[in-house]
Structure formats: C-alpha cells, structure tokens
Amino acid sequence: LAPKDPREAQVLDLLKKEVARLTRLVESLAHLRPGRREAFALEDLWLRLSALMQDRLRGRRVEVALGHRVEADPEALLQILLNLLDNALKYGQDPIRLLSRVRGGRVYLEVRDRGAPLPDYEGLFQPGRRGGEGSGQGLGLYLVRRLAQGLGGGAYALREGEENVFGVWLPVD
C-alpha cells in the first residue's frame, strides 16, 4: 500500500503503529500462561529488546547492567521488560537504568528512571490504571504482574531516592 500524499503516509504510519500495539497486547495475553522454561543470559534478552525498541531508544540514555542468568520463559520475560522499559521511556526521565541483582534466592530485574514521584505505586498494577497523561489502555503493569506471577515470581513499584523503580522478581532455581 503506497501513500499518495503526506497525509496518507501519516495515516498509514499511525495504522501500522496501532496494529503493532494491538499485536503486542495479544502476545501479552497469550503469555499469561507459562511457556517453555530455558536457561539464558539476561544480556541476550537485552539484545532482542534493544532491537525491538530501536526507534524508541534513539536519543535516550539507557544504562544496562544485566549480568545474571535465569531459567524462565524467555518470551514472557521479554514482554515484561518491554512493558517496563516502554513505560520508563514514556513517563520517565533519563538516565533510565535496566539492571539485575540476586538476593535471598531471587533474581530481581528492575527498570529505574528519574521521573516525578507517583502518588500510588501499587495502584498502577490494577487494570485500566495509567500513570500521568498516558495514552495506553492501562494494562501494561497489570500484564507485567500477571506474567511475573506465571513465572513463579511477583512485581513491584516504589520510589527509591530520586528514582521510580519498577521491577519483577523470579525464584532462583
């Protein structure tokens, strides 16, 4: 489908973006059931994530420290990080930090940003709730929590110092 004028090109671009968004939503819903588990390095997940979000990441400062291995469904974990990073890019301020750490039999994956403090972090995990002037459906963090629970873990959000922290934890096998 070739646009005939700039307005048509704009509409076509908008339609493509909406189809991509709806595709991601359907994929998120499909991943609510745990899939295959495999061991992999979180750095490998970052390579996939950065390729998917290449345009959104351009011009942004994202610091990545994912030095751990996990055993989980890689597609579900990719969707979790995609949702968390997408929110940080929409609502947060640079630098955005994506990191992992292990503590107490759990691996934690966090996306941290320097956005404004939020009034109700826990409420953001409810379906239909959005932070700020969001344009989405308010399902991103709800799906993050459900996916994390499907992997045997959980999701959380809090303010730590000058940063908003959105993360998930998974059990270490």
Feature map (PLM): residue ranges:
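Short alpha-helical segment of the dimerization/phosphotransfer core of two-component systems
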Residues: 14-21
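Short helix-loop "hinge" at the ATP-lid/N-box region of the Bergerat-fold HATPase_c
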Residues: 88-89
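Short beta-strand/loop element within the Bergerat-fold HATPase_c
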Residues: 95-105
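Glycine-rich ATP-binding loops of the HATPase_c
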Residues: 152-159
